[in-house]
Regions:
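Active-site substrate-recognition segment that forms the wall
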Residues: 19-23, 50-52, 88, 103, ...
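Conserved Rossmann-like nucleotide-cofactor binding loop
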Residues: 16, 39, 242
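Glycine-rich FAD pyrophosphate-binding loop
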Residues: 26-47
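Helix-loop-beta segment of a Rossmann-like dinucleotide-binding subdomain
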Residues: 94-116, 153-201, 297, 353-361
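C-terminal catalytic lobe of FAD-dependent flavoproteins
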Residues: 323-412
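N-terminal Rossmann-like FAD-binding beta1-loop-alpha1 element of flavoenzymes
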Residues: 6-33
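Dinucleotide-binding Rossmann-like beta1-alpha1 core, especially the glycine-rich loop
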Residues: 50-163
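Helical element adjacent to the flavin cofactor pocket in flavoenzyme catalytic cores
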Residues: 173-226, 230, 234, 238-239, ...
């Protein structure tokens, strides 16, 4: 048994666990991070698209712009609480954001391609509104105003529903194209930077440590693993599987089939095609050197994955005939879905008992907002905004590679 008593034990070494561990360490808390796998960020954070969402994609969602506001709030918090990280190269301006040099984010803006349905007035109106919202976000004054609380239905004028419909009719393409504020990211650089700061503040990490039991006793928590027992004042569970196991909370699993392709043309953009028929929505995120991730939407049923993957590949080859599929994989997405929801695109922070908390993250991009909000819920104040040095180098191999990168490395 470990004789140390930590302020916090964090169960789960994905982006949720890493950002929460860092924000706690930033304030001088003693933190132990437990991960069942050999490497950190080796499940959901490994397979995702590396897509930094501005919220624009959810301007089409019928949720009163709730998801959009959550994602804009994440960018607010990114600027406020992560701006002193060396790799944080997204910069606020008086009119949108810019990517400065190399670092966490790439100067690779994702093009939205709305499929034209000229005889579907509802879709045409939704597209018109979405385009207007993108314009508002692209022109937002990040230097003077926060965005998360600035965009709701009151910002959408009646004219926004129809003033872009003539442009859709005038377009000769099957799609109406609009460059969005969404960008691609370098997730391993980002995770490594955040982890290095936490390690510099004495974060302890134990990998290959499967949690067998979590016991709340005498105003503290005992976490029993396959190799040891650890004591802490509090614990937060950031692993969906562990949340389901120990807290009896149902977690929904869905499936995201992705093809890793090469020979992507240099003049092709990262893009997403949008259609009211969701299964026709495909996307391509460029990775450099002619490599790309070709994907679509997330499937609810595993049995539908193979046929849908074939559809995705065929559609991408139709647009870029020269691409070659290197390999494919299926990313698992595990979400806490509330009653009446099909998907969870936000995050949930729950206090399950006096000393045990749980967190489920809907989008990687929301981690920058989720971690500071977790700190606020616990300590009823804002976390420190400035990180301290020295930082500690992250041991090679501690963080897993992304699935797409592993596929490319193994193919060469």
């Amino acid at each position: 048994m470990d004789s140390n008593k930590y302020d916090w034990i964090v169960v789960g070494g994905g982006i949720s666990g890493i950002t929460i561990a860092e924000i706690l360490c930033r304030d001088g808390k003693s933190v132990l991070l437990l991960e069942k796998n050999k490497q950190l960020s080796s499940e959901t954070s490994k397979v995702f698209h590396e897509w930094m969402h501005s919220g624009s994609l959810y301007s089409l969602a019928p949720d009163k712009l709730l998801t959009l506001r959550y994602l804009l709030g994440a960018t607010d918090d990114l600027f406020e609480y992560y701006n002193s990280f060396s790799g944080m190269n997204l910069c606020p301006t008086e009119s949108g954001v810019i990517v400065d040099g190399t670092g966490w984010f790439n100067n690779d803006y994702i093009e939205y391609r709305y499929r034209k349905h000229l005889f579907n007035p509802v879709w045409s109106a939704l597209v018109s509104r979405s385009i207007n919202i993108i314009d508002l976000l692209s022109q937002h004054d990040w230097l003077r105003r926060k965005a998360g609380s600035d965009y709701d239905d009151s910002r959408v004028r009646f004219s926004h529903w129809f003033n872009n419909i003539p442009k859709q009719f005038a377009s000769k393409s099957d799609f109406f194209c609009k460059l969005s504020p969404d960008i691609t990211m370098n997730s391993r650089k980002l995770i490594s930077d955040i982890l290095s700061v936490a390690l510099g503040k004495d974060l302890e990490i134990v990998t290959e440590s499967s949690v067998l039991n979590i016991i709340e006793k005498n105003n503290s928590v005992i976490v029993e693993t396959n190799s040891n027992s650890y004591h802490a004042e509090n614990a937060v569970i950031c692993s969906p599987d562990m949340i389901s196991k120990f807290l009896d909370i149902p977690i929904k699993t869905s499936y995201a089939p992705i093809a890793v392709v090469e020979n992507v043309p240099k003049d092709e953009k990262s893009f997403v095609e949008l259609d009211y028929n969701l299964k026709k929505c495909i996307n391509l995120l460029k990775k450099g050197d002619g490599i790309g991730q070709a994907g679509g939407v997330t499937m609810e049923r595993e049995k539908d994955v193979d046929s849908y993957l074939s559809y995705i590949i065929a559609e991408h080859k139709d647009r870029n005939p020269g691409i070659k599929v290197v390999d494919t994989y299926v990313g698992l997405k595990k979400e806490l879905v509330q009653k009446g929801e099909d998907r969870n695109y936000i995050y949930h922070i729950n206090q399950n008992s006096k000393n045990i908390w749980s967190v489920v993250l809907g989008k990687f991009s929301l981690a920058f907002s989720m971690a500071p909000e977790f700190y606020r819920r616990i300590y009823h104040k804002n976390p420190p905004k400035i990180i301290e040095i020295p930082m500690e180098d992250v041991k090679k191999g501690l963080i897993s590679e992304t699935s797409w990168k592993e596929i490319i490395i193994n193919s060469r």
